[in-house]
Regions:
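Conserved beta-strand scaffold positions in the cores of enzyme catalytic domains, especially
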Residues: 151, 194-196, 320-322
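Conserved SGNH/GDSL esterase-like catalytic core that processes O-acyl groups on lipids
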Residues: 49-51, 117-124, 162, 167-257, ...
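Conserved hydrophobic/aromatic pocket- or pore-lining residues that grip, position, or stack substrates
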Residues: 154, 186, 274
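N-terminal secretory targeting modules
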Residues: 19-152, 157-175, 352-374
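Alpha-helical cap/lid subdomain in secreted, periplasmic
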Residues: 218-365, 369-370
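Hydrophobic h-region of N-terminal signal peptides that target proteins for export
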Residues: 10-18
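Bacterial N-terminal signal peptides that target proteins for export
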Residues: 1-7
Length: 374
């Protein structure tokens, strides 16, 4: 996929054909925001989470994007007129900057999608509006999707390393692209609005740091434990949980080491937290496609046992889907994410009644995964 890196300009009032431009401030009602965004200052909304996006329709050949990035480590994709094969990539610099949009636009109406590629660890970005040619304004945005989907996950869901070469390391933020994660692809396939709550290295019982998903999922600002998201602001039809990969690597570092019953109980508790926020959503408990789903792994069985328990308690609106392990030792690359999305799209779409059932995709389910001591 071709990519163009957009270099920042100094924040200036720009001139186009001798006429000063106009800034369309962030509180304009024709912006369409998606994801967990801090609107405490409507003229300076703050974006943290991977997959956060802003849509707009504008008129004219001039487009500049004004951002204030905290650390100069965040990356954004800019898509014009739904050309998803040729993104312009903004590599943020720290502070307030104006970034040029693509050259060669016609003077017609265009659609814009600004999409956060990187996860919250790169720091927040404040959106300060768009600069257009003098006399131009935002038009009415595309209709918001009727369907809504939300993901909770780890580095796989973030898209960590998905654009890295096969032989390379997969920890560079320039090579993390949430737009090409299985999660975002699945949302687009299903024509659903997308929300992504994910952090590389996180688990349910243990993470690579002193924070676990039960202490993270509810946050608006990911770095502030007192910052609480208002779940009433976004009610997904489907919630996909893809966690336990990091737990599978780290569980023996806990003292005492949890037994199978404790692991299942922790998963039940977390799914209960999600259910308490989304009473009507269908919850999909997934795992993979890294080695937590390899042959002989107990981790899919823990999830199956948790779901059996939830159903026995009366929660029938819950499903299981496992991504088969591909015998790949690194984070999934884009091709792996596409395969994951293909299967998940079919499974979720059928279960939600969004696509016809052609019986070509089923959850990867095996009784051999069930732990012996449950």
């Amino acid at each position: 996929m071709l990519r163009y890196y957009v270099m920042p300009l100094l924040l200036l009032v720009f001139l186009t054909s001798g006429a000063a431009g106009v800034t369309i401030e962030p509180d304009n009602p024709n912006y369409q925001y998606s994801g967990r965004i801090d609107f405490s200052n409507p003229k300076a909304p703050m974006m943290f989470w991977p997959g956060t996006s802003i849509r707009a329709t504008f008129q004219g050949a001039v487009l500049k994007i004004i951002l204030n990035d905290a650390h100069g480590k965040s990356f954004y994709s800019v898509f014009i007129d739904n050309d998803f094969e040729h993104p312009f990539i903004i590599e943020c610099e720290a502070g307030e900057k104006v970034y040029d949009g693509p050259a060669g636009l016609t003077d017609d109406a265009h659609t814009l999608l600004l999409f956060r590629r990187t996860e919250a660890s790169t720091g927040p970005t404040i959106f300060l509006g768009l600069d257009l040619k003098s006399g131009q304004a935002l038009l009415e945005p595309p209709a918001r999707p009727e369907r809504r989907i939300e993901f909770y996950g780890n580095s796989i869901t973030c898209g960590m390393g998905n654009e890295a070469p096969d032989s390379g390391d997969d920890d560079k933020m320039a090579e993390e692209n949430n737009f090409l994660s299985y999660a975002a692809i699945t949302a687009r396939n299903l024509e659903a609005e997308y929300s992504c709550i994910a952090k590389s290295g996180i688990g349910i019982l243990i993470s690579w740091f002193d924070l676990i998903m039960p202490d993270y999922y509810y946050r608006l600002d990911p770095e502030n434990s007192n910052s609480r998201w208002n779940f009433a602001n976004y009610n997904p039809d489907a919630v996909i949980v893809n966690l336990f990969q990091n737990d599978s690597w780290l569980i023996k570092n806990l003292d005492p080491v949890p037994d199978s019953a404790a692991i299942v109980s922790a998963y039940i508790d977390f799914i209960g937290k999600i259910r308490s926020e989304y009473a009507e959503a269908k919850i999909f408990c997934t795992l993979g496609s890294m080695d937590a789903t390899k042959s002989g792994s107990p981790w899919p069985g823990y999830i199956e046992s948790a779901v059996v328990h939830k159903r026995a308690q009366g929660d029938e609106n819950i499903e299981i889907y496992f991504f088969p392990f591909k015998n790949w030792s690194k984070h999934p690359r884009v091709r792996h994410h596409q395969e994951m999305a293909d299967g998940l799209t079919q499974f979720v779409g059928v279960k939600m009644g969004w696509i016809p059932d052609d019986s070509t995709a089923v959850g990867f389910k095996d009784d051999a995964f069930l732990p012996d001591d449950l």
